[in-house]
Amino acid sequence: MKVVTGATDGIGRSYALDLARRGFNIFLISRTKSKLVKTKKQILNKYSDIEVRYAICDFTRVSYEDYKRLLHSLNEVDIGILINNVGMCFDNPEVLHRVEGGIDTLTNVINVNILPVTLLTAGILPQMMARKSGIIVNIGSAAGSIHMAKWSVYSATKKYIEWFTSILQKEYENEGIICQTITPLLVSTNMIKNPLSSIFCPNSDSFAKSSLNTIGNSSSTTGYITHQIQFELIKFVPEIIIDLFVKNLNNQLLDYQLDKKRV
């Protein structure tokens, strides 16, 4: 069974569909039952010879007991791949004390971006250890490698994922378990509020297919060739230039939001 969190939208949904295309049984985790039912139906309509299970979990509201119940359900099956995809971002770029929603939003971003990847990984590793086999894919972001003004908490939580996974690689390198970080740049999803795909901003289906092909070949990758090219080039760019790029990106996102409100 292959587990995908945040599995009913964007990259997560695309991961689930592509894993199903490859013939794997899927365990979907998301917060909205209607979307889970719809995604399960869509998968089975295309790939009727696989099994699809799901669990409802809102990671902004989940309690310790909720995590225990979820892990109990997950450990009832053999899990070959865990894709920790669920994530949350601010609606708009803003300095820390002015983030829309205030402390509630900041708490949600921290809870969604850090706790699931940590606790689900810890809860599923024992069965992978027993089999000496398993794959854990943690979805971060290139935002975790750049000091992104007006995205402070989001960027920091993505850095956590990168650091966390690199340590797991050291801890489990002799246990038959692959731990991989995916750090994409812009992907056309609802999270980034940008519906337009391009060669440098692929749609989620193209991205998921590409990134799944990197498993076992790279411990840390952007998951997509044009993203990797950009990421390697960024290493040679002075930080002052990167800051200007981030500022321009923030302005574009704000303009996009304003245009949506005018429609």
From Swiss-Prot:
Annotated Gene Ontology cellular component terms: endoplasmic reticulum
Main enzyme class: oxidoreductase
Disulfide pairings: none
Domain of life according to the entry: Eukaryota
Cross-referenced Gene3D superfamilies: NAD(P)-binding Rossmann-like Domain
SUPFAM superfamilies for the chain: NAD(P)-binding Rossmann-fold domains (SSF51735)
EC number: 1.1.1.-
Protein's name in the database: Putative steroid dehydrogenase 4
Source organism (scientific name): Caenorhabditis elegans
